[in-house]
């Protein structure tokens, strides 16, 4: 897909009970994150429980966003990573064992929303240390990118 603009978007609404629970548990403003490409496509791991790309009309009342500077390398990485992970399932085990029970376990073939975003963007920017993406929350991703010069 040709990418003209790309944003990391963070779900801030309390529409669903699990959004409130996630925000409370992680002491965060956000319960979910994905990429928003060309102001049209929501890309990432979703409520549908797998990595997908779908047309979506984003509401600024429900989502905050950070626009990234687009370049050829980022465009290639996004397309390549999406192609490799498309259809990968949501990693509920990592959420429960790593974020609730602090067991630091994950399935490398499954992702949480923030894990998928962090791993993809770290291929371009190399800014997450240590590389334990499965331990990150949407708020962690927001904090890293809102404090860097990688945004427009």
What are these regions (language model features)?
Residues 10-69, 97-105:
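Glycine-rich catalytic cores of cysteine/serine-nucleophile enzymes that process amide/ester linkages
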Residues 27-30, 71, 75, 110, ...:
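Solvent-exposed, acidic/flexible segments
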Residues 1, 48, 52-53, 64-73, ...:
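Extracellular cell-wall/glycan-interacting regions and their flexible linkers
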Residues 1-12:
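Extended, non-globular alpha-helical segments
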Residues 99-152:
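Activation targets extended, charge/polar-rich intrinsically disordered C-terminal tails
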Residues 17-20, 73-81, 140:
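Exposed alpha-helical structural elements
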Residues 74-95:
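A structural motif
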């Amino acid at each position: 897909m040709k990418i003209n603009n790309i944003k990391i978007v963070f779900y801030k609404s309390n529409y669903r009970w699990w959004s409130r629970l996630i925000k409370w548990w992680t002491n965060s403003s956000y319960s979910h994150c994905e990429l928003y490409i060309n102001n049209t496509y929501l890309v990432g791991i979703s409520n549908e429980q797998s990595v997908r790309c779908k047309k979506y009309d984003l509401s600024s009342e429900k989502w905050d966003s950070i626009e990234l500077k687009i370049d050829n390398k980022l465009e290639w990485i996004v397309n390549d990573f999406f192609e490799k992970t498309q259809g990968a399932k949501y990693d509920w085990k990592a959420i429960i064992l790593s974020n609730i029970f602090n067991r630091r376990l994950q399935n490398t073939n499954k992702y949480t929303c923030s894990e998928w975003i962090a791993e993809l963007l770290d291929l371009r920017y190399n800014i997450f240390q240590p590389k334990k993406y499965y331990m990150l929350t949407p708020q962690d991703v927001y904090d890293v990118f809102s404090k860097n010069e990688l945004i427009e």
